[in-house]
Amino acid sequence: MIAIIATAIACFVVGGILSYVLFRYVLKSKYDSVLKDAETEAEVIKKNKLLEVKEKFLNKKADLEKEVALRNQKIQQAENKLKQREMVLSQRQEEIQRKKLEAEAVKENLEAQLVIVDKKKEELDKLQHQEIEKLEAISGLSADEAKERLVESLKEEAKTQAQSFINDIMDDAKLTASKEAKRIVIQSIQRVATETAIENSVTVFHIESDEIKGRIIGREGRNIRALEAATGVEIVVDDTPEAIVLSAFDPVRREIARLALHQLVTDGRIHPARIEEVVSKVRKQVEEEIIETGKRTTIDLGIHGLHPELIRIIGKMKYRSSYGQNLLQHARETANLCAVMASELGLNPKKAKRAGLLHDIGKVPDEEPELPHALLGMKLAEKYKEKPDICNAIGAHHDETEMTSLLAPIVQVCDAISGARPGARREIVEAYIKRLNDLEQLAMAYPGVTKTYAIQAGRELRVIVGADKIDDKQTESLSGEIAKKIQDEMTYPGQVKITVIRETRAVSFAK
């Protein structure tokens, strides 16, 4: 048993030793294999790194060679430029040297000529002195006395020429000033165009049928009395078909009455209480419209900083008229004319436009009727803090106060231009038509006249004469005779141009 155990132990020990030896052998084999693989891989990595380093070296070498070549090229270019500059400098030095030699030659020549000139000058001085002595001996005057007489003579001649020259300049200035003034006025008129509005002292209110007249009159006339009392307008209800006449000198009252009537007729309820309510409402609307019109006018003209009361007065101009010309349109037209004319004269166009717009504000208020409208307007402008030159332009535009501002004559002229424009102001229609008829009939009384036409609001009369009755020479004498007769027998504004027309027409037909 012991032997078996010993044998087993011996076998176990021998097996362990063999296993250890075998393990060592296998481990060494693996170690050798791994080492060999590592050496092989290291050799590959080494070769790759060497190739990579070599490639970088070659690239760097190529870059350096390019840079060196580029630098060499730049150096070569710089050397070429330097050589060119050296050549230019060399040429300039040669040119300078050549010019220096030429200048020295010219200097020597001038010095030689200067010597000759000095000699000739001495000779001339001697000759002049001799001539002066001879002249003094002949005339019996010294040189100083002769100079004084010559100077006096030249002074008188210069004075005469200067006076003549001054007179010529003054005549030319007068002619030029006249032409320039006409040009400025014409240009101002051409650049300003406004509509002409005609207002009357009555307003016609149209109705759909005459039945409405009875409702407006009311029982025993109470409605019409209430309407007249509320508006201050005379309401004329007569036999005129489908029309009621509103009569009042105050256009604002007429407008209030017209609008109130329109609302009452449209609404259908017409009785004293309703009339008072509608008139009160319309009066507020008209007042708002007046202020809105004033603001819109100042904005359109580019005028700022006006007192609210002045804006209200400007708005009321819409309902005022002067000789049939709407006052607001006249003020706007005058303002634009003033701005254009002031610009042409080198003055402030904004101030001129402001003065032109405000020049007739004295026609609007009803208070102080004893004052002329220009002075009342100046008083209002001063009250509402307008500048002195604008106040003076307002007050002096009808020569009722002294003109101290340059704007005053401009406003005066533009006011006259706006009022005198043909068609701007309305005469009484009957008188206007009668004057035109009288003009035409006056010319028709002459023998040989076949037709007459009064045009341009009666400022031009065209006379057509028969070609077989009057020759060309007689047309001139005829126009003169008609002009003289108009002057002697008629009253008219401005001037009337008479144009006599004589023509012969030959008409044939081609068939």
From Swiss-Prot:
The keyword RNA-binding applies. Its main location: membrane. Residues 201-261 form the KH domain. It is found in: Cell membrane. It is an enzyme of class 3 (hydrolase). Pfam families: HD, KH_1, RNase_Y_N. GO terms for molecular function: RNA binding; RNA endonuclease activity. Residues 327-420 form the HD domain. It is a single-pass membrane protein. GO terms for cellular component: plasma membrane. The chain crosses the membrane at residues 2-22. It comes from the Bacteria. Endoribonuclease that initiates mRNA decay. HAMAP family: RNase_Y (MF_00335). Belongs to the RNase Y family. This is Ribonuclease Y. It comes from Bacteroides thetaiotaomicron (strain ATCC 29148 / DSM 2079 / JCM 5827 / CCUG 10774 / NCTC 10582 / VPI-5482 / E50).
